[in-house]
């Protein structure tokens, strides 16, 4: 395969990996709220949505930071 073909394949794979699966769009969000913003380096992306986090954890957004966190519940 030529280098141009490899670059095209790599680009398509990158776009495919960034797309949210259609099957996950209709899922409800997990209960609870995200806790206060953590002290982390800028723009860390551990997850894309709640269903990419283990157990009860939620995918929490803090600016450009996305990470799996245990939810908090407010009464």
Swiss-Prot record:
UniProt keyword annotations, A-Z: Antibiotic, Antimicrobial, Disulfide bond, Secreted, Signal
Occurrences of domain WAP (ranges): 27-72
Subcellular location: Secreted
Name of the protein: Carwaprin-a
Cleaved signal peptide residues: 1-24
SMART domains listed in its UniProt record: WAP
GO molecular function: serine-type endopeptidase inhibitor activity
Any matching Pfam family: WAP
Entry GO terms, CC: extracellular region; extracellular space
UniProt keyword annotation of Disulfide bond present: yes
Annotated tissue distribution: Expressed by the venom gland.
Organism: Tropidechis carinatus (Australian rough-scaled snake)
Keyword Secreted on entry: yes
Gene Ontology terms: biological process: antibacterial humoral response; innate immune response; venom-mediated disruption of cell wall in another organism
Disulfide bonds: 34-60, 43-64, 47-59, 53-68
